[in-house]
Structure formats: C-alpha cells, structure tokens
C-alpha cells in the first residue's frame, strides 16, 4: 500500500481525549498530559495519533504529528461506506453500517470524531465491549481499513469489471 503524503492534503484535526497523569514526588505532584488526536481531509483519508507532554498544546501538537504518519484511505460510496464491517482492538469492537443519504453520522464520542474527519456523512455505528477512547478509535480505524472498494473486490476475486 502506498504511503499517503500529509503535506499535499488539507488536514483538519480533532482532539478526542485528553488525559492528565500525576507523578508523585517529594515536593508534591508533577502533572503531564496525553492527547488522543484524529486527523482527516474530509474526503476519505484519516489517521490517529497519541501525543504526550508536560503541557496540553504540546501534547496535541505531538499527537497531530504522529497522526499524519498513520494515514489510511477509506473507500467512500455516496458519503457512506460500501458494506457492514466490524473493527476490533483490544476489548473494543466497533460495528459500522452504511446508511441511506440524509441519515447523518449516528455515532458517539470517539467513533463520531473519526468518521467526521474522514468525510463519512451517512453511517450507523455501535460500540461493543470497551468504551475506552483509545480502544474505540483504534477499532474504528481498523474497521475503516478493512473496507475495500467495488473495483478492489472485483480484482481480488478475479471477476470481470462488468456489473
């Protein structure tokens, strides 16, 4: 699979989750932050990243940089996906179903963020198992990466391109 160059794209980023950690030292607590970020161009390209730093803006910046290195292409069909798919990561499962035009994004939290930046406009989703944002984002990306366009499926099956 070809690597997608982020410099050629107009990417938007969305912060999914910010976590504050505390290291207890002799003088008190030292706080650090981690940010889970998704980026996408709104036309079928999406990626996620996890940045950690002492300050929130720096953690977000690091997350965006990492997300730009993990981009995947999603085959869209009329602002939806071509078929039902289940993505898995850890204990998290995400079910994605295509929806008719005008339905909108029926998804919660982390799944909604990933789908909106990727450019999916009409879709139904359900989180099964873990609701941890990290697991849900990775499971959603896994589900989207399992999708194939009609042309790719025909080529895999060796069928002629006639419908």
Swiss-Prot record:
Question: What superkingdom heads the lineage?
Answer: Bacteria
- Which GO terms fall under biological process for this protein? translation
Q: Gene3D superfamilies given for it?
A: 3.30.160.20, 3.30.230.10
User: InterPro entries under this entry?
Assistant: Ribosomal_Su5_D2-typ_SF (IPR020568), Ribosomal_uS5 (IPR000851), Ribosomal_uS5_bac-type (IPR005712), Ribosomal_uS5_C (IPR005324), Ribosomal_uS5_N (IPR013810), Ribosomal_uS5_N_CS (IPR018192), Ribsml_uS5_D2-typ_fold_subgr (IPR014721)
Q: What does this protein do?
A: With S4 and S12 plays an important role in translational accuracy. Located at the back of the 30S subunit body where it stabilizes the conformation of the head with respect to the body.
The family line of this record is: Belongs to the universal ribosomal protein uS5 family.
Q: How does it assemble?
A: Part of the 30S ribosomal subunit. Contacts proteins S4 and S8.
* Name recorded for this polypeptide: Small ribosomal subunit protein uS5
Show the taxonomic lineage.
Answer: Bacteria, Pseudomonadati, Thermodesulfobacteriota, Desulfuromonadia, Desulfuromonadales
Designated gene of the protein: rpsE
